[in-house]
Amino acid sequence: MIAMSQIVFLVDVDNTLLDNDHIQGDIRAYLAKEFGLACRDRYWAILEDLFVELGYRDYLGALQRYRVEHPQDMDLLSMSSFLVDYPFANRLYPDSLDVLARFRGWGPTVLLTDGDVVFQPRKVERSGLSEAVDSQVLIYIHKELALDDVEVRYPALHYVLVDDKPRILAAVKNAWGNRVTTVFPRQGQYAHDAKTLASFAQPDVTVDRIGDLLAYDLGTLVGGPRISTQRYAEEKR
């Protein structure tokens, strides 16, 4: 039986620890340069269709579907190498590894992310994030629907969830209530999206960047005053 922890930290990957918007920009630029704008736009349309269908962006799946449309295009094979060999470690947000180290000093720390079964694990491994949390990694299709499994694997009296998506933070808060402290790093596409911010409950803690969490001690993070509350409210207006 797994022992109950006092506190467990659950940390998202894309646009929380890793600048996924930058990665997407690099993929788009590579496609345009190597295969042309039409290829880039068609690939991205397939990628977005898969996002709607699956709930996460399946980069390799989109490439395979594009290949079905262009079965004679052998040049596409180089795109898979670009994706698999991408230097993810270069896209870590400043201080992200230090934040994970700080969390690990306080309690078990787990990467909690969504994604496919090939590209997402590769991203987590090559970025150095898996090593930073001693391979404590959970990759789901919809993590907000897998909370029972998370609790079985990492039972705790209290959880801290760090995620750039207000929707995820709100869903987990609704499920776990006061047993979870939700932390919103204002990074990525949702950072200043007034419509999204207005649609979901305010997180317990809001910071401008993941590295700002180094300024917190455990008591302040979990039970102390919530900074940036006024700024979050202003974004919602």
Label the model's feature ranges.
Residues 16, 23, 117-118, 167, ...:
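Conserved Rossmann-like nucleotide-cofactor binding loop
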Residues 23, 34-38, 47-84, 102:
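A metal-dependent, Asp-based hydrolase signature
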Residues 2-45, 68-69:
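Active-site neighborhood of HAD-like aspartate-dependent phosphohydrolases
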Residues 60-61, 81-111, 144, 148-149:
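Short, acidic loop-to-helix structural element flanking the phosphoryl-transfer center
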Residues 1-5, 125-161, 165-237:
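Asp-based, Mg2+/Mn2+-dependent phosphohydrolase catalytic module
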Residues 10-12, 112, 161-162, 207:
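Generic enzyme active-site microenvironment
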Residues 17, 109, 161:
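Conserved SAM-binding loop
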Residues 97-110, 114-138:
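Substrate-recognition/cap helix-loop segment adjacent to the acidic, metal-dependent catalytic center
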